[in-house]
Amino acid sequence: MVRSIAIASGKGGVGKTSLAVNCAVKLTTEGRRVALLDADFGMANSHILLDKKIENSVNDILEKNLNIEKVVHETPTGLKLIPGGSGVLELLNLDSQKRWEIIRSLDALKNDLDILVVDTPAGASDASVEFSAACDAVVVVLVPEPTSFMDAYSFIKALYLEKKFESVSIVVNLAKNEKAAKKSYDSFKKIVTKFLNVDMNFLGWLPESKSIAGSIVARKPAVLQKSLEPILQKNFSEIANNLAKIETVKSSGVKFFNNK
């Protein structure tokens, strides 16, 4: 059975897409069959981080009735990229019916995948909540800043109230060290659990690094760089492995691959 995992965030600029791309690539290089759905429709940029020229996107499923197989782009590592489309205004305001069509279109890939990673739109929009809740598990990326905490809380609250999603995992990005990352996580967990009946799980952390910024400019995933700092190699590996083992969370609404 394919496991679907949403990578989400309460706000943009916290490293969500970078984490989604690098973890998807890492899992692929370890022998798993992985697809990355860039669900940040209309503003998708996973293909840029992967240096992949795209021909078709999710928009072509909706507008041209293309099969999902014609939208999947193979990358050199074996990762299957499903681009969300960039600069397509129609994709910015998809209604629930079109979101359902996209989710159901991936059913055709269920025998070809082990893991689906979904890079969701930042924030607590209807699209972000629905695509996140359609996954078996949700990972929220936050940074040690009050605004990140506030926006991540708003997203988790929407996910809980609208979709009965009662468990999320957290990755702390741009942390000074492991101790600081866990302190940020503990502080955020206290805020969430004080007001919401949501289980929290610390999935891992990443330090601030010029290598990450450089990999984005170079259009090459950081985990493929031989010169990547050992701490980043270690932490990306741990987060990716934790993603593969993350427990399924029950929620209401439509699910990828009809998983319940």
Where do the PLM segments sit?
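P-loop/Walker-type NTP enzyme "switch/lid" segment
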Residues: 36-111, 214-218
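Short, hinge-like loop/turn segments at secondary-structure boundaries
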Residues: 51-56, 158-159, 186-189, 221-223
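Conserved catalytic-core segment of NTP-binding enzymes
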Residues: 115, 121-204
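Walker A/P-loop phosphate-binding motif and the immediately C-terminal alpha-helix
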Residues: 2-40
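Residue-level signature of catalytic and energy-coupling elements of molecular machines
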Residues: 12, 38, 46, 61, ...
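Short, well-ordered alpha-helices that flank and scaffold nucleotide-derived cofactor binding pockets
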Residues: 21, 25-29, 133, 157, ...
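Beta-strand-loop-alpha "switch" segments that mediate conformational coupling across diverse proteins
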Residues: 195-223, 236
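NTP-binding/hydrolysis catalytic cores, primarily Walker-type P-loop NTPases
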Residues: 217-260
